[in-house]
Design a protein with these regions (language model features):
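Short, solvent-exposed loop/helix junctions and linker helices
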Residues: 9, 102, 148-152
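Short strand->helix junction
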Residues: 44, 62, 148-149
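Dinucleotide-binding Rossmann-like beta1-alpha1 core, especially the glycine-rich loop
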Residues: 52-126, 130
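Glycine-rich FAD pyrophosphate-binding loop
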Residues: 29-50
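Beta1/beta-strand and adjacent pyrophosphate-binding region of the FAD-binding site
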Residues: 4-20, 36
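Short beta-strand/turn micro-motifs composed of small residues
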Residues: 16, 39, 96-97
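Helix-loop-beta segment of a Rossmann-like dinucleotide-binding subdomain
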Residues: 86-94, 128-153
């Protein structure tokens, strides 16, 4: 920064360079605001840099907690829209094993769709191509729009 730049007032000062702080700084900057981001250590070295990186579709909650499922997929779609460069499209699989009730699969798919979550029934052979380490005896598979987030991008 030049001397002139440091004497101009900032519109927004954000404390913390994790996902929330950096994302807020980016959003404010894109709106034309003058932003100062203050971080004690390095960007994403706190909780953000230690997360598992899973971008939930909300499918895991669809049958038992529709409200949480709806919130997850809405936030999933917002993140894909505003920070697509941070999201890796991985999809997720929900597998039905021989000891499971295959009829539950349709209940699961219906609940996902009611919550606004894309849920595609796929052939178990296709699921095994996607995830070769899965149990080869699966009798059903559903693909959902899970993803992975790189917190350092």
């Amino acid at each position: 920064m030049t001397q002139h730049e440091t004497t101009k007032p900032f519109d927004v000062i954000i404390i913390g360079g994790g996902a929330t702080g950096a994302g807020t700084a980016r959003d404010c900057s894109r709106r034309g605001l003058r932003v100062l981001l203050v971080e004690r250590f390095d960007i994403s070295t706190g909780a953000t840099g230690r997360n598992h990186g899973l971008l939930h579709s909300g499918a895991r909650y669809a049958v038992t907690d529709k409200e949480s499922a709806e919130e997850c997929i809405k936030e999933n779609m917002i993140l894909r829209k505003i920070a697509s460069h941070c999201v890796e499209e991985t999809d997720g699989l929900f597998l039905t094993l021989p000891e499971d009730d295959i009829n539950y699969q349709s209940k699961f798919v219906d609940a996902c769709r009611q919550a606004g979550i894309r849920a595609d029934v796929i052939d178990p052979k296709e699921a095994l191509k996607m995830e070769p380490s899965a149990n080869p005896d699966i009798i059903g598979a559903v693909r959902v729009p899970d993803g992975a987030v790189d917190p350092f991008r």
